[in-house]
Amino acid sequence: MAIQIPSRLLFIDGEWREPVLKKRIPIINPATEEIIGHIPAATAEDVELAVEAARRALSRNKGRDWASAPGAVRAKYLRAIAAKIGERKPEIAKLEAIDCGKPLDEAAWDIDDVSGCFEYYAELAEGLDAQQKAPISLPMEQFKSHVLKEPIGVVGLITPWNYPLLMATWKVAPALAAGCAAILKPSELASVTCLELADVCREVGLPPGVLNILTGLGHEAGAPLVSHPHVDKIAFTGSTMTGSKIMTAAAQLVKPVSLELGGKSPIVVFDDVDIDKAAEWTAFGCFWTNGQICSATSRLILHENIATEFLDRLLKWCKNIKIADPLEEGCRLGPVVSGGQYEKILKSIETAKSEGARVLSGGDRPEHLKKGFFIEPTIITDVTTSMQIWREEVFGPVLCVKTFSSEDEALELANDTHYGLGAAVISKDLERCDRFSKGLQAGIVWINCSQPCFCQAPWGGNKRSGFGRELGKWGLDNYLTVKQVTEYVSDDPWGWYTSPSKL
């Protein structure tokens, strides 16, 4: 099925603009390794134009057009964006699948979530007005105090390639709901659908400069955005290494950041489980989105009493996963996003073998696919806690396995990581699950499942998985500042100093 990739420019101040230096980057279909189009490559010159446009959007008509407009005004645009994306779902889902390798059914699910996220933040935008001037109870009756919530200003949003449009929406929707003006810099490996978001914003008449979208390389477009003195906040999702660099750059300007970084999340399976149900959740938790999930539960911590039976069943589930072109009906595992990622994942598997681990299944290209960046679902056993495969994020369809004999041992293994994004526990004993969830050092815990995500619930991690929370009301708070306003209401003078009239 031939899909035409739209030829787009940068989106600045409500208009399509050629990059100042006229640079472009090829789009490579990860299923075929073919160049299927190009995206514009922004540089510091384009960042400057986008920042100027964003600041104009905030100050236009003394802020009444956007930043200080009633929340219902902003909600109207967010709902229009949600509706338009819903109308274009079949087209956008196919573009997503072709661009990043995600199976079409997953991409379609993502686009539904995109629309839902814009709708959700439209509701929160409407609710903001009622929260203004919330009174504060004070111990001194001579004073009254209230709180104002105001947009933080111009925000830079840097997003990854595994959920290109959805992860962008997680940042764009709350930022716009709060009244900020935003500059979105998606990953150069998968930017196509973010440029379609720009087209949607044009169609619905979003005020110029409220959302600007700059595609391009991290060091050419992302770095100037982070270090720009007139960008008030950076929100980033991506690798821990890049997140550390962003923190360092932002610190020079004491600029706030929120970071959602890497993970090496555990899934703990006790011996009282329904083995088929637990095996499917284990596979889904690691191989969904081709294994390219920051929260992937890629460390299976398995009770020794059921280890042999469970792994045998898990292998059968994995062999039943259809690996194919993302547009092929029934595809459940597509290619990883790029040649670079493909080589990195295979190297991680080879390193595990060289360190003494055993590849129980997978570990290579599927025999029936001669082209594309495809990797079989891979299960690795005989793992020790010092091995790289146990400690470092692979970001591919690779699951490593260790067994345990006691609950305390399982918890120790689960927390044996410098990451802390997600964790899952599977057991029929719900008291144990509750107890275990409290002991897990992670920002997200799943009980008897893995990876479900809802825009109403907070998302974010601990330790080297970053800080700050996206989604829910916490996601909106990311883009708001809190201002205290205190008024002296007594008719009496303050009386601290002696009045000159009494001298």
Swiss-Prot record:
Main location: cytoplasm
Lineage: Eukaryota, Viridiplantae, Streptophyta, Embryophyta, Tracheophyta
Record-linked CDD domains: ALDH_F10_BADH
Family listed: Belongs to the aldehyde dehydrogenase family.
EC number of this enzyme: 1.2.1.-, 1.2.1.19
Record protein name field: Aminoaldehyde dehydrogenase 1, peroxisomal
Site (Transition state stabilizer): N162
UniProtKB keywords: Cytoplasm, Metal-binding, NAD, Oxidoreductase, Sodium
One BP annotation, GO: cellular detoxification of aldehyde
Binding-site positions, Na(+): I28, D99, L189
